Amino acid sequence: MRASTILFVLGAAILAVIGVTTALDSGEIDKSTQENHRLLRSGSMEQEPDEERKFIKVPSFMNKAAREAKKAKKKAEIANLVWLKLQKYSDSYALNYVDDMVKSGRSADDEIKFLKKHMKVSNNLQRVIEGHFRSHAELGRVLAKPKYK
């Protein structure tokens, strides 16, 4: 190499070093921010290998909305099941009587006792009625407005 080329490269390196130090001193480049970025990059590479990736956590309000929608869908399916079971194992007089019981304000226990006494209601159906339709107003709403699939 020629001496002029070596001097040219050395001069360019000196100017680059002077420019960086001037920029750091004047505050154009924040040294602590630069170091933080470097540490974050190196730390993230060490903590997350390729075979083990972390997933982003869904915000809780999204989970709650999904849970509520799932509960509502299941409740509607169970309401439909109860209605179909009651129609299968009963006559129209018994369903009218249950509607009258609901309108008169009797409790859910009275309705369940009536269903067990006058219709073929299995223990499983009784648990469904007790668990999901405890209030007589809700049971009355299900019986008054059946939904068929």
Curated annotation (Swiss-Prot):
Presence of the UniProt keyword Signal in the record: yes
Alphabetical keyword list: Host cytoplasm, Host nucleus, Secreted, Signal, Virulence
Protein localization: Secreted; Host nucleus; Host cytoplasm
Signal peptide (UniProt feature, chain positions): 1-23
GO cellular component: extracellular region; host cell cytoplasm; host cell nucleus
Chief subcellular location: secreted
Extent of motif RxLR-dEER: 38-53
Function statement: Secreted effector that completely suppresses the host cell death induced by cell death-inducing proteins.
Protein family (similarity comment): Belongs to the RxLR effector family.
Domain-level remarks: The RxLR-dEER motif acts to carry the protein into the host cell cytoplasm through binding to cell surface phosphatidylinositol-3-phosphate.
Official protein name in the record: Secreted RxLR effector protein 3
Species this protein is from: Plasmopara viticola (Downy mildew of grapevine)
Gene that encodes it: RXLR3
